[in-house]
Amino acid sequence: MREISVPAPFTVGEHDNVAAMVFEHERDDPDYVIYQRLIDGVWTDVTCAEAANQIRAAALGLISLGVQAGDRVVIFSATRYEWAILDFAILAVGAVTVPTYETSSAEQVRWVLQDSEAVVLFAETDSHATMVAELSGSVPALREVLQIAGSGPNALDRLTEAGASVDPAELTARLAALRSTDPATLIYTSGTTGRPKGCQLTQSNLVHEIKGARAYHPTLLRKGERLLVFLPLAHVLARAISMAAFHSKVTVGFTSDIKNLLPMLAVFKPTVVVSVPRVFEKVYNTAEQNAANAGKGRIFAIAAQTAVDWSEACDRGGPGLLLRAKHAVFDRLVYRKLRAALGGNCRAAVSGGAPLGARLGHFYRGAGLTIYEGYGLSGTSGGVAISQFNDLKIGTVGKPVPGNSLRIADDGELLVRGGVVFSGYWRNEQATTEAFTDGWFKTGDLGAVDEDGFLTITGRKKEIIVTAGGKNVAPAVLEDQLRAHPLISQAVVVGDAKPFIGALITIDPEAFEGWKQRNSKTAGASVGDLATDPDLIAEIDAAVKQANLAVSHAESIRKFRILPVDFTEDTGELTPTMKVKRKVVAEKFASDIEAIYNKE
């Protein structure tokens, strides 16, 4: 199958907009707890009425600052409660939210401010505000910087005070004037070359995403469910899901404290989480490693295989009596503990940003946590395809979100069009023209649609490796297999214009400590110290051989190199959503890549 379309069971009217639901909830269900926010370490209830009052006050404050419809307003902050409130306030006055990662460099922030000509910026911390102050001479359009946290008055208080003299009828008029075709957000996304491009999404794009998500997941997105958002809200996935949750009256909490995520989950007790595959891989690998360190590695291995077998059997008519009995035993011994680590009430998750892998998907479903995998880009307002609660095929990213169509081009590239697809790049007609063909958005991803209409993503078009022998290799297949090993943190497949495929491997710091202990290595030895250790080489070689089973001989990894350091966002090799920056890795570790191909 080359094309599939799913009609929308809803409509988006001329005046439909994102902010409208804030005041609809206030009118229809004022006392319902729509948010919980952290105040001095305690999750504190925020009702629909309280949230609407804060959003209204912030919106009036923006009006008092002279923010006009269509003006760009930057949020330069990590995920937190205030982020969502400010976002709704910006949208309510008809302005355009420009999200910026809290880890952005000064040069990145400068470009966003210059290109968007933003008039107001919300800075999270003192250091963020200081960075922006140092840029003031080069961003003439910026009139106001308000600080969300840190020293001095906070942004919400300042906006409330400033807006106190504004007639609320001003906001009512702004809301009434909103059109679904109006711009809502400008998301800067890096291209293959040059500076980041501003991806323009309209109110209609976001409303289509919100309603489409609800149509596919009425049992996850419904009143009474609980969602903890810990991915960056600057990323379209987290923002779109949190908006969809708000629309469906899911109680939402926010945190960016990833180091203390497990204690947060234990207290918040979400019923659903949204994450990227690397987090699910890490949870699995940590559980496997902890079992090995406790001398229970074999028990965990059998439990993991039982979970996979049970899930696969569910797709074939259901597990038999013996498998059900084994599954019940391991549910008490293993799976229940895994679910407890996520707060005890979590029964489903949404994964996006990269392929999850069929084995991991089957494991989690077998362990009692179904992961609904989706696919999307900034240009598709978040998800353009997602697995459904009642129509799931593990290993795929599901079918189009209602109101959208998918097509596979002759060269395998995935093309999309529909309600969630963006209108173009900000002030960049050339890039917009290049991004579309006959009205279809060229995603840059390679995919396939099976006979049942399920989409599988096989890799990025620009990441395809062409060896010296002319073999095309999609690195994601091998890399996903390698990261499944508990000792491996990241893997980057190389080999463009080279005689064979190679790989750079980084070691998981936590797993490494347990491995050293089990293999009687010096406690203080670093990965660099043991990079050529025969036992470590043998362990990674076994993982490489296992990964190679997923590809042909010509695509298999012939040699690998263990790097002395892991990739991190701080050192520049990972994006905020934990994707590897291949170009950065290739430049930083050029000598290691060359060493793979040096004749010995």
UniProtKB/Swiss-Prot annotation:
**Keywords associated with the record:** ATP-binding, Fatty acid metabolism, Ligase, Lipid metabolism, Nucleotide-binding
Q: Which InterPro entries match?
A: AMP-bd_C_sf, AMP-binding_CS, AMP-dep_synth/lig_dom, ANL_N_sf
Per its record, what are the GO molecular function terms?
A: ATP binding; CoA-ligase activity; long-chain fatty acid-CoA ligase activity
Please give the SUPFAM superfamilies that the UniProt record associates with this protein.
Acetyl-CoA synthetase-like
Q: Which reaction does it catalyse?
A: a long-chain fatty acid + ATP + CoA = a long-chain fatty acyl-CoA + AMP + diphosphate; dodecanoate + ATP + CoA = dodecanoyl-CoA + AMP + diphosphate; hexadecanoate + ATP + CoA = hexadecanoyl-CoA + AMP + diphosphate
Its GO biological process annotations read:
Actinobacterium-type cell wall biogenesis; fatty acid biosynthetic process; lipid biosynthetic process; long-chain fatty acid metabolic process
Q: Which residues constitute the signal peptide according to the record?
A: none
GO CC, sorted alphabetically, is: peptidoglycan-based cell wall; plasma membrane
Instruction: Give the protein family.
Output: Belongs to the ATP-dependent AMP-binding enzyme family.
Record-linked PANTHER family:
AMP-DEPENDENT SYNTHETASE_LIGASE DOMAIN-CONTAINING PROTEIN (PTHR43272:SF32), LONG-CHAIN-FATTY-ACID--COA LIGASE (PTHR43272)
Specify the protein name.
Answer: Long-chain-fatty-acid--CoA ligase FadD15
